[in-house]
Amino acid sequence: MALPVYYDKDIDLGVIQSLQVGIIGYGAQGEAQALNLRDSKVKVRIGLYQGSLSVPKAKAEGFEVLEVKELVQQSDLIMALLPDELHKEVLEKEVIPFLKEGQIVGFAHGFSVHFNQVVLPKGVGAILVAPKGPGSALREEYLKNRGLYHLIAIEQESSKNNAKAVALSYAKAMGGGRMGVLETSFKEECESDLFGEQAVLCGGLEAIIRMGFETLIKAGYPEELAYFECVHEVKLVADLLHYKGVEGLRKHISNTAEFGAIKNREPMGNLLEKRMQKILKKIQNGSFAKDFLLEKSLNYPRLNTERKALKETKIEQIGEILRAPFNHKK
């Protein structure tokens, strides 16, 4: 691997166990991280605003809940596990004014720091600890004595605590050292994560799926078959890729499927490459971040419109019917 990678044997869990951790937010990541930390014998409190719907849940799970500014004053490490677009507002009002030299502020994504939405005072550490998976998977893997890959990065050193040692120890407490903790930078994590979401995992994949579905529908094929071939079977392929890689996927599909993929890969790739380069450029030069923060300031008009429109599409309507048996089994 090109990146430095650390495992449990390389990391001192005692570093994070000696500190008081405060987690701001109790969504999927906040809950999973807090539970994993507590099970790793780490002292952790939760910071939420008065009236937050998450307060009863956090208290029911045995955590002490404080207002954010109180949490900051009583913590050595403060983890900001909030949506990216809320970091500037919350940290400028409730966190930064109460920070002291030697404390560390942690993030699960580099967006707000890399794009200068959050600038921490000198002497306050800035670390990134990013589990490569959703909160549900982070918790499930920990309970199975396994873990997810984690990324760490150091943007600013603390005047009191070694920021890298704290980041590594935090990742170990969440189970990351069981799989591997890779060291990167805020810039690399942020830009590659945004690119992956936009060009492949969310934007690119959804675009190809919906385009494939609509192509078959317009050609007169039944909606059910279009859904099976363009949506339903994506999981089968994704699982093969996840566990066996591209070569392993090739070995598990038919010769017909493999030949068809190879034959059409180049023309499709040529079309996608230029678009992907444009996507990456807009991420790198900050124009995507600017557009996203403007969307937030206007109360998400485009997101709300798109979400409403998606419910009315054929792909969602037939999908809801075909997914019903799977959801019923849960």
UniProtKB/Swiss-Prot annotation:
InterPro entries: 6-PGluconate_DH-like_C_sf, KARI, KARI_C, KARI_N, KARI_prok, NAD(P)-bd_dom_sf. It is an enzyme of class 1 (oxidoreductase). Its cofactor is Mg(2+). Residues 3-184 form the KARI N-terminal Rossmann domain. Keywords: Amino-acid biosynthesis, Branched-chain amino acid biosynthesis, Magnesium, Metal-binding, NADP, Oxidoreductase. Mg(2+) 2 binds at residues 193, 229, 233. It catalyses: (2R)-2,3-dihydroxy-3-methylbutanoate + NADP(+) = (2S)-2-acetolactate + NADPH + H(+); (2R,3R)-2,3-dihydroxy-3-methylpentanoate + NADP(+) = (S)-2-ethyl-2-hydroxy-3-oxobutanoate + NADPH + H(+). Residues 185-329 form the KARI C-terminal knotted domain. Substrate binds at residue 254. Mg(2+) 1 binds at residues 193, 197. GO terms for molecular function: ketol-acid reductoisomerase activity; magnesium ion binding; NADP binding. Transmembrane segments: none annotated. The active site is at residue 109. One of its GO terms (biological process) is L-valine biosynthetic process. NCBIfam families: ilvC, PRK05479.1. This is Ketol-acid reductoisomerase (NADP(+)). It comes from Helicobacter pylori (strain Shi470). The gene is ilvC.
